[in-house]
């Protein structure tokens, strides 16, 4: 075990020190005591020992972690699913089928892949719910000049990718805001989905959420079925779509995000409300400008965890 593995680790959480050595010492002690005393009743303590070993071993198995914020670990690709013409969902196996990702809402993971002899690092937001176990789901959109997204597109089941995390600064607490407004664009929906899963899986969280989601075309709207299902099941959540190039069948808003749409669909400024923005830089800057004009207090520097207007 490396030094970084040992640091911050309780030595008794390691199977050798917390299970095998104590169990062996106990068995030897029982054998010696039984031999010297002739009391066979002492052997009845062995089933209790085996129960303790089982509980400790099961706990150690569940404690195995797949992600660390300070070092890389390799995860195996289980499968991939195409969800749009240039986007796919990649499912990676965690170390055990019992493990659930404990990633704070709105935080991301770092991904490292080898390309042309160099290690390229990118950041993605897992969309796996805390209630799901055994896997990590990433949505990756392929870009014409995207080296890492092209690398992902070439992966096959059984291939491995290096991960590190969680990483991020957003702070979210249940019921910390009465009304949460969100502006998202393209693949910027992934951290939003994390937050939505965090809210709707906690019955006590009564935060109202309004989402304004922009894309180039209807086919570019990622995870639309999931978002529509959430909006149907949870009365506190509303979603509004905007597309730049609509089809003849489109009945929603058209164009780019506007100040009027933000004013119409999202909460107004209040100390009890909050605004999150996640998308391409151009959209983020435009949404920030509109937020200022609508009275929101915008931090002039990089967003920090508790900012009322937070840009991912």
UniProtKB/Swiss-Prot annotation:
Gene3D superfamilies from the UniProt entry: Nucleotide-binding domain of ferredoxin-NADP reductase (FNR) module, Translation factors
Cofactor(s), by name: FAD
Pfam families, per the entry: FAD_binding_6, NAD_binding_1
EC code(s) of this entry: 1.6.2.2
Amino acids binding FAD: 153-168, 179-211
Record-level GO cellular component terms: endoplasmic reticulum; endoplasmic reticulum membrane; plasma membrane
GO MF term set: cytochrome-b5 reductase activity, acting on NAD(P)H
Positions in the Extracellular compartment: 1-15, 61-179
Regulation of activity: Inhibited by diphenylene iodonium (DPI).
SUPFAM superfamilies: Ferredoxin reductase-like, C-terminal NADP-linked domain, Riboflavin synthase domain-like
Keyword field: Cell membrane, Endoplasmic reticulum, FAD, Flavoprotein, Membrane, NAD, Oxidoreductase, Transmembrane, Transmembrane helix
Membrane topology: Multi-pass membrane protein
Catalytic reaction annotation: 2 Fe(III)-[cytochrome b5] + NADH = 2 Fe(II)-[cytochrome b5] + NAD(+) + H(+)
FAD-binding FR-type domain residues: 70-173
UniProt-annotated location(s): Cell membrane; Endoplasmic reticulum membrane
Top-level taxon: Eukaryota
Cytoplasmic topological intervals: 37-39, 201-312
InterPro entries named among the record's database cross-references: CBR-like, Cbr1-like_FAD-bd_dom, FAD-bd_FR_type, Flavoprot_Pyr_Nucl_cyt_Rdtase, FNR_nucleotide-bd, OxRdtase_FAD/NAD-bd, Riboflavin_synthase-like_b-brl
Membrane spanning stretches: 16-36, 40-60, 180-200
Functional note: NADH-dependent cytochrome b5 reductase that reduces coenzyme Q6 at the plasma membrane and mediates lifespan extension by calorie restriction by shifting fermentative to respiratory metabolism, probably through modulating the NAD(+)/NADH ratio.
Additional remark text: Present with 29000 molecules/cell in log phase SD medium.
Protein name: Plasma membrane-associated coenzyme Q6 reductase PGA3
The species this protein was found in: Saccharomyces cerevisiae (strain ATCC 204508 / S288c) (Baker's yeast)
Gene this chain is encoded by: PGA3
């Amino acid at each position: 075990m490396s030094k970084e593995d040992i640091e911050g680790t309780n030595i008794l959480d390691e199977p050798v020190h917390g299970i095998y050595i104590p169990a062996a010492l106990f068995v030897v002690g029982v054998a010696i005591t039984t031999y010297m005393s002739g009391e066979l009743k002492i052997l009845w303590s062995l089933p209790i020992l085996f129960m303790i070993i089982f509980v400790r071993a099961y706990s150690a198995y569940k404690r195995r972690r797949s992600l660390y914020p300070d070092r890389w670990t390799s995860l195996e690709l289980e499968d991939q699913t195409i969800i749009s013409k240039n986007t796919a969902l990649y499912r990676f196996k965690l170390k055990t089928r019992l493990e659930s990702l404990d990633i704070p809402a709105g935080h991301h993971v770092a991904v490292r892949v080898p390309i042309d002899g160099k290690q390229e690092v990118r950041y993605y937001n897992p969309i796996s719910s805390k209630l799901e176990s055994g896997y990590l789901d990433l949505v990756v959109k392929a870009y014409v000049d995207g080296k890492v997204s092209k690398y992902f597109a070439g992966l096959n089941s059984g291939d491995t990718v290096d991960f590190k995390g969680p990483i991020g600064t957003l702070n979210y607490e249940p019921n910390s805001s009465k009304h949460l407004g969100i502006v998202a664009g393209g693949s910027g929906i992934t951290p939003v989905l994390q937050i939505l899963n965090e809210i709707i899986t906690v019955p006590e969280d009564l935060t109202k959420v309004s989402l304004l989601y922009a894309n180039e075309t209807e086919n570019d709207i990622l995870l639309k079925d999931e978002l529509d299902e959430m909006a149907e099941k949870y009365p506190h959540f509303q979603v509004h779509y905007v597309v730049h190039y609509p089809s003849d069948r489109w009945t929603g808003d058209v164009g780019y995000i506007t100040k009027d749409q933000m004013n119409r669909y999202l909460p107004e400024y209040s100390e009890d409300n909050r605004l999150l923005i996640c998308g391409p830089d151009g959209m983020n800057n435009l949404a920030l400008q509109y937020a200022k004009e609508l009275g929101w207090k915008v931090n002039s520097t990089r967003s920090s965890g508790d900012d009322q207007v937070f840009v991912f």
